[in-house]
Amino acid sequence: MLETERDNIRKHFLKYTRQAFQGLPKMESPHILDVGCGSGIPTIELAKLSGGQVTGIDVDQSQLSILNERIVEEGLSRRVFVRNCSLFDIDFPDETFDVIWAEGSLHIVGFEKGLKEWRHLLKSGGFLVAHDGIKDVSSKLDRVPVLGYKLVTHFALPEDTWQTKYFEPLEQLIQKWRNKAKTPETLSLLESYQNEVNMYKMNPKENVSAFYIFQKT
């Protein structure tokens, strides 16, 4: 299945998910919100790392359906939950979560908007972990205290990570499937993947990213 093979490429980034998680203090059975979870590559990993409860939210029901299948396969039905929910209107009670995890979703919502609007969802002293670009990072981090957080730590991914671990393998995957793709759905996926690659090639230096750990103050 094409989407499964693409997700296998995305698993190259789990080493950085694990590294970021190790930057958090030890918590017993934390409640984690995975914002923009997609098909749940980090979601499942977070459940295994934390031993706690993970709620994944996204608006793409097809991706959530894949995640639901993975939850059953991994035997995590009592600890991992999904909800079809907009990233711009997250409807949970105040102070529900110990950790908010955002791998790529701040890029969609906006750095300042995400930190500001998601803050009330965190318990006192809770953490927001974000995988985001490093463009304008100094000005972004200057705003963090004003938004009600402090920076705990951050680390950048190696500069060639996106090229060697994602876009080059993705391009190889596209070539592999191009001649055997038959269904409109598969052809549409291939087109979307190719668009990703094309956008990357237009400005590869934009695809340098880092993990940030913020604590609610």
Named regions from a protein language model:
Residues 1-12:
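Class I SAM-dependent methyltransferase Rossmann-like catalytic core
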Residues 10-28:
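Conserved alpha-helix/loop element of class I SAM-dependent methyltransferases that forms part
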Residues 33, 39-89:
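Class I SAM-dependent methyltransferase SAM/SAH-binding core
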Residues 88-99:
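A short acidic, Gly/Pro-enriched loop at the edge of an enzyme's catalytic core
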Residues 99-112:
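A short SAM/SAH-binding and catalytic strip from SAM-dependent methyltransferases
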Residues 112-127:
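A short glycine-rich, Lys/Arg-flanked "PGG" loop and its adjoining helix->strand segment in the class I
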Residues 158-217:
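Conserved Class I S-adenosyl-L-methionine
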